[in-house]
């Protein structure tokens, strides 16, 4: 084995020379240079500085402006709440531990950090799934005479929490476990060992199928159908400049959102899958740390894509930031008239 396994950790470094120490008790500077740990801390600080304001502003704007408190926007608020879990439950902890070079909060702290970081990430993931389904239902109308309302929006939000808990809670009660990962300064699900005592293999398979493959399939299907429907409508109304513009905006939105999803989750899932299917193979701590950067960065770019590209939200944010005056001269409700045509389809 090219790593060292302890009772509640796995360090991706052979202990042939006897230098490996518990990531809960000693700095892990044999895994990476001290400056690399400092860079990790700096990156976490950047995520906090950028991630907290934009997500907090989303919630604040919703309280201040009634016209954005619509059922179709509930899931966007849920996304902002999920990102706060990631900021406070994961980023702040990793910032502190990176400055010390090891996970100073012990095994219990690892469980808590792993749980909240996973919970926030999974709520965000399933929020994107629900958002795709909602847009598919509203635009493509697979069910005739169906009207999307507040109860449906609340059910969608509740669904994201149920699915997130179904992923984040089992490691706390004996199905898999949370251990330090990468440079041993943050905690996540154990992809490194089979650990039959906690049925780790079955949980990892469950994770890849239910919490990666299925969400990705749903998102690709819904947005594929959405683009097809909008293009078909545009072809039937070629003389309408508004319809043509909406088609281009929707297509652009779908491309951006699919790419964002892939950037966020594919690197992390791919590396985790490789590590799990190549038990004992030689890999450095950076291999798992870098993909985690992409996943954690979603707390910044997901709000930008899904919220700030929403014209209603954007106008209200500008009005709030500029003390009640939109510098671009657009009124908060300027998109209300076209809401059924574009704002429910695309956040552009």
From Swiss-Prot:
A lipid is attached at residues 322-323 (S-palmitoyl cysteine). It is found in: Membrane; Cell projection, Cilium, Photoreceptor outer segment. One of its GO terms (biological process) is G protein-coupled opsin signaling pathway. Keywords: Acetylation, Cell projection, Chromophore, Disulfide bond, G-protein coupled receptor, Glycoprotein, Lipoprotein, Membrane, Metal-binding, Palmitate, Phosphoprotein, Photoreceptor protein, Receptor, Retinal protein, Sensory transduction, Transducer, Transmembrane, Transmembrane helix, Vision, Zinc. It comes from the Eukaryota. Its main location: membrane. InterPro entries: GPCR_opsins, GPCR_Rhodpsn, GPCR_Rhodpsn_7TM, Opsin, Retinal_BS, Rhodopsin, Rhodopsin_N. It is a multi-pass membrane protein. It holds the Pfam family Rhodopsin_N. The modification N6-(retinylidene)lysine is found at residue 296. A motif ('Ionic lock' involved in activated form stabilization) lies at residues 134-136. Photoreceptor required for image-forming vision at low light intensity. Required for photoreceptor cell viability after birth. Light-induced isomerization of 11-cis to all-trans retinal triggers a conformational change that activates signaling via G-proteins. Subsequent receptor phosphorylation mediates displacement of the bound G-protein alpha subunit by the arrestin SAG and terminates signaling. The keyword Metal-binding applies. Zn(2+) binds at residues 201, 279. Residues 62-73, 134-152, 225-252, 309-348 are cytoplasmic. The modification Phosphoserine is found at residues 334, 338, 343. Phosphorylated on some or all of the serine and threonine residues present in the C-terminal region. Contains one covalently linked retinal chromophore. Upon light absorption, the covalently bound 11-cis-retinal is converted to all-trans-retinal. After hydrolysis of the Schiff base and release of the covalently bound all-trans-retinal, active rhodopsin is regenerated by binding of a fresh molecule of 11-cis-retinal. This is Rhodopsin. The chain crosses the membrane at residues 37-61, 74-96, 111-133, 153-173, 203-224, 253-274, 287-308. Residues 1-36, 97-110, 174-202, 275-286 are extracellular. Homodimer. May form a complex composed of RHO, GRK1 and RCVRN in a Ca(2+)-dependent manner; RCVRN prevents the interaction between GRK1 and RHO. Interacts with GRK1. Interacts (phosphorylated form) with SAG. Interacts with GNAT1. Interacts with GNAT3. SAG and G-proteins compete for a common binding site. Interacts with PRCD; the interaction promotes PRCD stability. Forms a complex with ASAP1 and ARF4. Forms a complex with ASAP1, RAB11A, Rabin8/RAB3IP, ARF4 and RAB11FIP3; the complex regulates Golgi-to-cilia rhodopsin/RHO transport in photoreceptors. The record marks 113 as: Plays an important role in the conformation switch to the active conformation. Disulfide bonds join 110-187.
């Amino acid at each position: 084995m090219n790593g060292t396994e302890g009772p509640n950790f796995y360090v991706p470094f052979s202990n042939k020379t006897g230098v490996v120490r518990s990531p809960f008790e000693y700095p892990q500077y044999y895994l990476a240079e001290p400056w690399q740990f400092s860079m990790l801390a700096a990156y976490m600080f950047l995520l906090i500085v950028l991630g907290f304001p934009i997500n907090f502003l989303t919630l604040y704007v919703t309280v201040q402006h009634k016209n954005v408190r619509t059922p179709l926007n509930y899931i966007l608020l849920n996304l902002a709440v999920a990102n706060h879990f990631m900021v406070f439950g994961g980023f702040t902890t990793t910032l502190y531990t990176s400055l010390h070079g090891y996970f100073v909060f012990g095994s219990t702290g690892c469980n808590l950090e792993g749980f909240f970081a996973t919970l926030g990430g999974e709520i965000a993931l399933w929020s994107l799934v629900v958002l795709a389904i909602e847009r598919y239902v509203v635009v493509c109308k697979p069910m005739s005479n169906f009207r999307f309302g507040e109860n449906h929006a609340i059910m969608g939000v509740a669904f994201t929490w149920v699915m997130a808990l179904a992923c984040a809670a089992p490691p706390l009660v004996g199905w898999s476990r949370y251990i330090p990962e990468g440079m041993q300064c943050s905690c996540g699900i154990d992809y490194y060992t089979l650990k039959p005592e906690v049925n780790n293999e079955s949980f990892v398979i469950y994770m890849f199928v239910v919490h990666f493959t299925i969400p990705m399939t749903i998102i690709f299907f819904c947005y594929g159908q959405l683009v097809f429907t909008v293009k078909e409508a545009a072809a039937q109304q070629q003389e309408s400049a508004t319809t043509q513009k909406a088609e281009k905006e929707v297509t652009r939105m779908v491309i951006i959102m699919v790419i964002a999803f892939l950037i966020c989750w594919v690197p992390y899932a791919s590396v985790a899958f490789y590590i799990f299917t190549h038990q004992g193979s030689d890999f450095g701590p950076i291999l798992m740390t870098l993909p985690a950067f992409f996943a954690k960065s979603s707390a910044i770019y997901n709000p930008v894509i899904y919220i700030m590209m929403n014209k209603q939200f954007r106008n209200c944010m500008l009005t709030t930031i500029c003390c009640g005056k939109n510098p671009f001269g657009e009124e908060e409700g300027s998109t209300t008239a076209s809401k059924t045509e574009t704002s429910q389809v695309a956040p552009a």
